[in-house]
Design a protein with these regions (language model features):
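Aromatic "clamp/platform" in nucleotide-sugar-dependent glycosyltransferases that forms part
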Residues: 263
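Nucleotide-activated donor-binding/catalytic signature segment of Leloir-type glycosyltransferases, i.e.
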Residues: 76, 218-246
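A short helix/loop element that forms part of the nucleotide-sugar donor recognition site in Leloir-type
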Residues: 145-164
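N-terminal strand-loop element at the rim of the active site
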Residues: 1-41, 48, 132, 215
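Short hydrophobic beta-strand element within catalytic cores of glycosyltransferases
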Residues: 280-283, 293-294, 300-303
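Carbohydrate-associated surface elements
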Residues: 114, 138
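Short N-terminal targeting/anchoring amphipathic segment
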Residues: 35, 47-67, 82-84
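Conserved donor-binding/catalytic core segment of Leloir-type glycosyltransferases
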Residues: 163-181, 187-190, 207
Length: 336
């Protein structure tokens, strides 16, 4: 695997994770090597790896624009091994400008049902020459799982956020502070919710925001909170310290619900984490978040996007899993 970073400190030093991988998944014969590199690699490095490691295929992950250098030599590579691409696309309209990228691959694996449909829409007649599959995002159920309410370590963790013991309802936001996550909308929704409650009820509610308070890719969240809650009665807790996976599992188990109102979302990992811990969620109906709501069509089957109904954001179907509270958009906008 090419282990890329902007300026990787270990460039040139191969890291062998085979033993750790064997232990993690209880096998004996894995071969997992990391080749640290700057950026996303280059033609010279890929040619060297094909010659040295003799892989059966190349698997790409992330936005195609980071691999333009690879797509420029796809004819050279595909005479030796296939190029496969585990890909995601946030939302409609279908990115027709990606057609040449998709066509440079032998197999496309869509992380969401919408992505698989978008791959097919963009390729058109060329789709018959490709392998296109839906491979939903997954997480390790040994890392995120439901805990009993009387779990000692969980209750010890709860005391960090509920030190006076009077909180009866906690809503969790866990994601990056970036524009498309619509965090100010989440804070405004929290205000509208609190406005429906009495003073005594408000004091029993809490919004935990596990994110960076200020980010150049997002906004100044403390400023938003001060603007919407000049009386400082918001009951919002900012959690910006890095937590271990075990602590994150505690956080999801502590919450009564999770909220994610992204305007565009390829998948929405915080929803998957909430599902594994048995925590219901509120989410915008867009992208891969729809998969996790499990909408049902008129035939009683799990909704699968088509060119005619490429997304359920227009409220074509309303029946979904009992764990989800869908938020259907009231308006559409082009961003870009």
């Amino acid at each position: 695997q090419l282990a890329g970073a902007i300026k990787h400190p270990d460039t040139g030093r191969i890291q062998d994770l085979s033993e750790a991988t064997n232990k993690e998944i209880d096998i004996t014969d894995s071969s997992v090597l990391l080749y640290p590199c700057d950026g996303y690699g280059d033609e010279k490095l890929v040619r060297m790896l094909i010659e040295k490691e003799k892989p059966d295929a190349i698997l790409l992950i992330t936005d195609p624009r980071y691999f333009e250098w690879l797509f420029n030599i796809e004819d050279e590579i595909r005479t030796q091994i296939p190029i496969t691409y585990l890909n995601i696309w946030d939302d409609l309209p279908a990115p027709m400008y990606n057609q040449e990228f998709y066509d440079s691959c032998d197999a496309l694996f869509g992380i969401s049902k919408q992505t698989k449909n978008i791959n097919e829409m963009v390729l058109g007649d060329k789709v018959k020459n490709k392998v296109i599959k839906y491979i939903p995002h997954g997480l390790n159920h040994k890392k995120f799982f439901q805990l009993e309410n009387n779990d000692k370590e969980l209750n010890k963790f709860k005391s960090q956020f509920n030190n006076n013991g009077n909180k009866e309802f906690t809503l969790l936001f866990n994601s990056r502070n970036i524009r498309r996550k619509s965090i100010p909308d989440t804070i405004l929704a929290w205000k509208y919710f609190l406005d429906t409650l009495s003073k005594e009820e408000r004091e029993k509610c809490q919004l935990v925001m596990h994110t960076q308070p200020i980010d150049q890719n997002g906004t100044d969240l403390p400023a938003v909170i001060r603007f919407l809650f000049p009386e400082d009665d918001h009951n919002i807790v900012m959690s910006h310290q890095k937590l271990t996976i075990e602590q994150m599992n505690f956080l999801y188990n502590y919450a009564d619900g999770v909220i994610l109102l992204s305007s565009a979302e390829g998948w929405g990992l915080s929803l998957t984490e909430s599902l594994l811990t048995g925590t219901p969620f509120i989410a915008n109906v867009t992208g891969g978040m729809q998969d996790q709501m499990r909408f049902v069509d008129e035939k009683g089957k799990w909704f699968t996007p088509t060119p005619d109904v490429p997304s359920n954001h227009k409220k074509t179907y309303t029946e979904c899993g009992e764990w989800a509270l869908p938020v259907f958009p009231t308006n559409l906008s082009l961003v870009g």
